[in-house]
């Protein structure tokens, strides 16, 4: 059957109404297949779902299914099919929407009621169909069955006819006589509504007196039944009070056991929590050991990297020493060149002196020609002024060159001092780094990075200083070349001056000044050579210091490596100790875990014993209930037997008494051989013992009422029969107050109070041993049972059967038989 069109229409109208009033507004839908796509987020928000954005129909219907399964409508979810609903099945979609409306009716009834009232007032929703659906749901709740709860959604016959089109049915050609209503019989049978077992003929034949007598007889029977039932009710109420008292005691014991179980559960939970804490501690110790091993490996790696960096520093130092050697070689070459220049200057000075002597001779020769050359003096003076200007420029250039050379020397000295300071600073930083790394291995990475950066910067600085020194050397070489060029130019100019002097005598003084300037320049060059010699000596001393520093650094490095080896050995020893500690901790933890496991097993065994005790108590309660039913039967039988003994005369009882313990039967057979006073005196000598049973503690049927088939043989009819009562000392000690006893004359006609042992005491044990020494018990298990020791060998029936049997005690009738004989 398909879905009703009216239901689909009303659902579409209602969901479109919800969509128009929802914020943000949603689009209207024309079929229920578009419900998840356009109104899915609205329905999810109205049902307070966690997921409100759906990409597929499967996800939407799965989320709605899970939400409904968590509500009170979960018993209806067995018939939902999310996959069919996602595929577009209209019946499954209507099921989901119907449960959605039912959820809204239960959890958001106010909102749904306002929406339906407003929609019905605006004629936008056909609410009659929805109200019928809600009424159908109420009927489902009242019937407490969820079978076919979606029957209200199916199309009925009228909907089928309406969907197929209305049409007039065809007329049938039935005759009116064939449509007569059937009638009942002329007279109903009397047994149609009667519950009597007698036949209606017997009821008709009976006379009124017979009916009256029958009613009287039934009244007497009912009264007797009522009286018996009232007595039974009284006995049952007594039994009920006793059972209720026992039930209360059992409940108290059960509550105590539950409290013990709760305490044991708390202890077990604490033990489990302690075990978890110990496991967490072990994990933490493992993590610490792992971290220590990682730190050790990292320290080894850092030490290796430091060794590599030190080796690289050694290589760089060797390179620097090689560069210093090259610098010293260059300085030697420069010194050699300076010596050559000095020799050349000496040679030129000697040549100038020779020329001076020659010029003096020429001056003497030319003094006579001075007058003639006065006219040419003005021109020579001009030439002299120009030469003076040139000499001044040359002297300035020489001074500048000397200043530049001094500046270069100072720069070289500064660079060398900077290098030495940087080397000293580097060595100090290396020592500090070594100490810091040996003191704190955790800061190795950061310090290594800093050292690398500093080392790279220092390499850059050393490279820049080397490049600057190389540039200075190149500049000095260029300056040397320029000086050589200047010297060559000076030589050329001196030659030109010589030519001019040879040409004119007036140029002698100018040449003398030029010679003086040349002497000054030579002196300056000598001073420069001396300064260069000093610089070379200083560089040699610095080289020696550098060699000494390198030696000291090697010694310090060897000492540091030895210290590092010692500390590494100490760390290895500490690591071995830590590993031993971890092994001991693991062993201790394993022992603690085993101990706790044993404790937990003991606690579980204790709990299992408690559970077994509870089950045993439950079984005992069931046994008590069975005893109650048995007691009811016994009470009925005892009532009947008591009535028989009360109503029957002594002789009738004598006829029924077949037990050898029956005193009236014995006296009737043998006659009164002794008087009553003698009999009472004899009875007084014997201890009083109860022979009545404890009906409440006996769980076997000992007889049945008259009229029922007995479960014993016919000879056991006496209430005083020995076979009727269990000769157990425990049952004798727990007899009811209504039990009958053979008593002494002082206690004749009174009931013996039941013995309820309050526990085994020293006095009680003494009393029992004294009694059993005088009169030994019939059963070996009686003493152990009465004392309460169930572990005694006499408490086991198998031991009793296998052991040697005792002679039966003499009964009370032995005295009579001995007197008779």
From Swiss-Prot:
Coiled coil ranges: 211-634
Q: Where is this region: Disordered?
A: 161-199, 736-758, 779-821
An individual GO BP term: gonad development
Predominant location category: cytoplasm
> Where is this chain compositionally biased, Polar residues type?
162-180
Cellular component aspect of the GO annotation: cell cortex; centrosome; condensed chromosome; cytoplasm; kinetochore; kinetochore microtubule; microtubule organizing center; mitotic spindle
Q: Where in the cell is it found?
A: Cytoplasm, Cell cortex; Cytoplasm, Cytoskeleton, Spindle; Chromosome, Centromere, Kinetochore; Cytoplasm, Cytoskeleton, Microtubule organizing center, Centrosome
Q: Give the keywords, sorted.
A: Cell cycle, Cell division, Centromere, Chromosome, Coiled coil, Cytoplasm, Cytoskeleton, Kinetochore, Mitosis
The UniProt regions of compositional bias labelled Low complexity, in chain numbering, are 181-199
User: GO MF annotations for this entry?
Assistant: dynein complex binding
Q: What does this protein do?
A: Essential component of the spindle apparatus required for spindle positioning and chromosome movement. Acts to recruit or anchor gpr-1/gpr-2 complex to the spindle and cortex. Also involved, directly or indirectly, in cytokinesis and in the coupling of DNA replication, centrosome duplication and mitotic division.
Assembly: Interacts with gpr-1; gpr-1 forms a complex with gpr-2 and GDP-bound goa-1.
| Record protein name field | Spindle apparatus protein lin-5
Q: Which organism is it from?
A: Caenorhabditis elegans
